């Protein structure tokens, strides 16, 4: 595996006026961009970028800057396959020659990043290509445009960067790939990170949730407080069903019984027997109700282990044709499990949880939450409900995904009546 540097180093280098290399996903452009902060642009930095890249220098900007400077889309209907939001090209109106030299382009870059600049400070068209970044940065769109703006903002600078794709020194008709980029980074003392690293860092270190509403919800397992949250950048709503006092005058947020439940429309609502999701949700609510204190966190956007409802139905088609639940996802070009628990972890922290007993049969869920500073003192298994429709699915989860599911080899049709785990408590 190619060695990468820390996001912290990359941010520090951006703040110091240095360039960094950012690599995107191999299934996307699979390229490395040279990136620096636009307000730190110098003729030497631009000349270095021109020498080792394609020379098509772009300046990613946040939406507010684009609006202030009147930077309209280059074309009304964006047909770029990655949705890169090119705007009209510009040059600085004053202090430049033709606009193409390294010195001229550095001047234009700095002016684009200047919070006092106005639309009339630029001529159109020009030799620098502004790009409009998505609000929310790499959490909304995992592109180099957003990475550049995020890095500049994280460095305490204006949300404006400069980017260009690095060309291979072995084959100048191609772009440099990961191994060659590492060599290049070492030769020039440049930090190298991935967009995935940046996404992970932001999820872990920034707050991305907002508490919206709270209401009393009477259920057949008793009464819960339903606390609603929105995920700011993903436009997804989540609900925490809370029983008892989690943290307050009589509770310290420790030893909380918690279930983090991934949304499953087919299992939770329709009662599908293809999975065990509905019974797990029911059992978790009953166990928390019996405990008298705990949380069932219902995570929206996790449908089909994060691949979405339509893809899940397509995966079901492949399973009916003989694939298992893991291979069906992979055959669709999707990960076996695409869920991220960062938002869930932030919600639990907001609710006052410090340590928990986690209701799950999935050890990976424990790892996913542990990484966000929550202390998991115990993994509490959930009852397994088997039937002829879900036994193969459960065996695949056990054998390929490491779920702790005992007794499947002794399968016989399980019969469970409604309310088995406690009824109305």
Curated annotation (Swiss-Prot):
Any one cellular-component term (Gene Ontology): cytosol
Cite the binding residues for D-ribulose 5-phosphate.
28-29, 33, 141-145, 165
- Name one molecular function that GO assigns to this entry: manganese ion binding
User: Which region ranges are annotated with the description DHBP synthase?
Assistant: 1-204
Query: So where does GTP get bound?
Result: 259-263, 280, 303-305, 325, 360, 365
**What are the record keywords, sorted?**
GTP-binding, Hydrolase, Lyase, Magnesium, Manganese, Metal-binding, Multifunctional enzyme, Nucleotide-binding, Riboflavin biosynthesis, Zinc
* Residues reported to bind Zn(2+): 264, 275, 277
Name-wise, this protein is Riboflavin biosynthesis protein RibBA
